[in-house]
Amino acid sequence: MKGKNEMSLVLKNVSKTFVGKVAVDNISFSIEKPGVYGLLGTNGAGKTTTIRMLLGIIKKDSGEITWKGKEVDRENVNFGYLPEERGVYPKTKIYDQMMYFAELKGMKKDDAITAINKWAKELKVEEYLQMPAEKLSKGNQQKIQFMNAIIHNPELVVLDEPFSGLD
């Protein structure tokens, strides 16, 4: 049986304010089991801010965020992230972009090539690997962004507005 901290994400009394405006106010939740979870709320409710704090992209003002019993820091977690704002390099070939992101995540070249081919086949984007991103539909660009998020086999994948632009 796995220990309690094997898959434990905990946010406890987390808050964030931007220039006097409260973006996240004392949010608490925990996830103890693998699965698909969602943050629901209206526009401006703080979902993206919560995600960015959880990933260590922005600092929280107060509270605790832990993964497997350790305080979350951008450098000490193996998370994948698909941001709401899509970011592909329009003139760069998809394969080159994938290699770049794999390198950023510390993957060995052979492992990166294997992962790129595996995920391109799985997501049905093999034919686009040698094309620049600007030639792809928004939906296929989003699939490429998803590949970037999972290429390094992260322990946790966080998706922000994951289905916008997909069929």
Question: What name fits each language-model region?
Answer:
Residues G63-V77:
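Conserved ABC transporter NBD signature motif
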Residues I151-E155:
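A short, proline-enriched helix->beta-strand linker immediately N-terminal to the Walker B motif
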Residues P132-L136:
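Conserved ABC ATPase signature
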Residues E85, K91-L104:
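Q-loop/switch helix immediately C-terminal to the Walker
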Residues M99, E103, D111-Y128:
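Conserved ABC ATPase "signature" region
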Residues V157-E161, L166:
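Catalytic Walker B motif of ABC-type/P-loop ATPase nucleotide-binding domains
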Residues F146:
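Hydrophobic anchor residue at the start of the ABC signature
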